[in-house]
Design a protein with these regions (language model features):
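Metallo-beta-lactamase
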Residues: 42, 49-50, 113, 141-146, ...
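Short Pro/Gly-enriched beta-strand edge/turn motifs at strand-loop
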Residues: 14-20, 114-117, 139-140
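Active-site HxH/HxHxD metal-binding segment of metal-dependent hydrolases
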Residues: 50-55, 59-138, 221-229
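N-terminal amphipathic/basic-hydrophobic helices that include classical n-h-c signal peptides
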Residues: 1-18
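Conserved beta-strand hairpin/beta-sheet module of binuclear metal-dependent hydrolase folds
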Residues: 14-65, 156-168
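Conserved Rossmann-like nucleotide-binding pocket used by diverse enzymes
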Residues: 22, 73, 143
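Short Gly/Pro-enriched turn/cap motifs at secondary-structure boundaries
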Residues: 24-26, 125-127, 146-148
């Protein structure tokens, strides 16, 4: 039986939703690659698969919408979030790639991590560093919030007008990122979630690095890993 391709989840471009988000689960670990877009511009977040691993679907979407890619934003530098950066840069050579300075020491290890999964090494690239605070990528605007703990330089991208935040592997539906990998730190992660994410409005939609979307208010009430009795999940 032939399997149907995975379809992206989409928000629709409307007057009340000027910066929708298309989500594509791609790559060996089904990383959510998020495309934030307006009528003309696009921001690609965490391209975790190569051309054969789902990135082509992202490229086809960008072409179909006739979007101009303004930047690639990496929430952190684990291999499953950066696998498609080099092929994306081949298609859009002038597009900058941004990551937190705190994660740069992980890059060399991450480039080789695919071999542990029987995959070719991640092709090298050189990211520019991005600061915490308001930022613009063409007509796309939001705020970088540093959310370390899963990695030393993890970051999230908050879009206040859209009531949405892209959290990478910091916060998931009813879970948080694992902290047993090199550079992980559970107290830092829970503190970042509480101070940088749980301070957002309760109706903020959460677009995580893996799995389904959720909302800040729901995670504040129901997430079992951000409570006084904290434990470290090993699922991601």
């Amino acid at each position: 039986m032939k399997l149907l391709p995975k379809l992206p989840t989409l928000q629709h471009l409307t007057k009340d939703n000027p910066m929708p988000i298309a989500t594509f689960p791609i790559g060996p670990l089904d990383t959510n690659c998020h495309v934030v877009y307006t009528e003309r511009d696009a921001l690609v977040v965490d391209p975790g698969g190569d051309i054969d691993g789902g990135l082509q679907d992202v490229l086809d979407f960008i072409a179909r919408k006739e979007l101009s890619v303004k930047a690639v934003l990496l929430t952190h530098l684990h291999f499953d979030h950066i696998y498609g950066v080099a092929p994306l840069k081949e298609r859009f050579p002038s597009v900058p790639v941004f990551a937190s300075a705190g994660d740069l020491p992980l890059l060399s290890t991450s480039l080789a991590s695919g071999e542990k999964w029987g995959l070719p090494p991640v092709r090298p690239f050189t990211p520019a560093t991005i600061a915490e605070g308001p930022c613009m990528f063409g007509s796309i605007h939001g705020e970088i919030r540093f959310t370390p703990g899963h990695t030393p330089g993890g970051l999230s991208f908050w879009m206040p007008q859209e009531h949405a935040v892209i959290t990478g592997d910091s916060l998931f539906y009813r879970s948080i990122g694992r902290t047993d990998l090199p550079g992980g730190h559970l107290p830092a992660l829970t503190e970042a979630i509480i101070s940088k994410l749980f301070t957002l409005p309760d109706d903020t939609d959460v677009y995580p690095g893996h799995g389904p979307n959720t909302r800040i208010g729901d995670e504040k009430r129901l997430n079992p890993f951000v409570r006084p009795a904290k434990k470290d999940p090993a699922s991601r």
